[in-house]
Amino acid sequence: VYGGLGADARQSIDLRGQVTELDTYQKNIASAKLRVSSAVETMDRIKNVARDVREQLTKLTGNPPPNQTVVQDIARRGYEEIVQLLGTQVEGRYIFAGSDIDNPPFPDSAQFFADVQAEVTAFAANGAAATLAATTAIATDDAYFSTALQAADPSPLRARVDRNLDLSYQVRANGPESPAPPPGELAPFREILRSLAT
C-alpha cells in the first residue's frame, strides 16, 4: 500500500495516525459537550419544575385555606418529575450519577419520600424544629443515592481532548462535592427534593 510512496511512506503513516488521533479527540469533545449541555438543560428543567410548583402553591394560598390533598398532589407530581429528570441518560449513560454512569443515581427516591413524609406526619407531636431537623437529616443522608454517590470522592468523568489534556466533569444527583453549601444549608438538589417531599 505504501510502496509507491518511497521516502514519503513513513510520513504518510504518521499523518494517518495523527488524523485518527484527532478524530478520536473530536469524538470525545462532542460526547462530553453533549453530556454537559444535556446536564445543563436538565438542571434548568429541575429549576423550572421547582419554580412551577412554588407558583402553583402560591396561587392556592388565601382564604379559605387550600385543600391539603391538592397541595400534596402538586408537590408529589413535582417530586416525581424531578426524580425522573435526575435519571436522565445521554448515550445510555446516567448524567447525574457521577462516575457510575451505568446505574441510576437516586434508586431509593420512594424511600426518601416516605421517610420525609413520616417526619411531616409526626409534625403535630414533634414540633417545627424537630421536624425541620429530621427532614434535613434525611436530605443530607447519602444512603438514598447510588453506591458511587455515597463514596467520599468518586472519580470524575474524563474525556481525552488532546494528547496531553483530559477534561474532567461530572454533576452529581446528591449535590456538588465542592464548594460545599454553607453550614445549615442543603445542596440545591437536596433542598428541592426535601421541599417537594414535605
Descriptions of predicted regions:
Residues V1-P105, T198:
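Amphipathic alpha-helical polymerization modules
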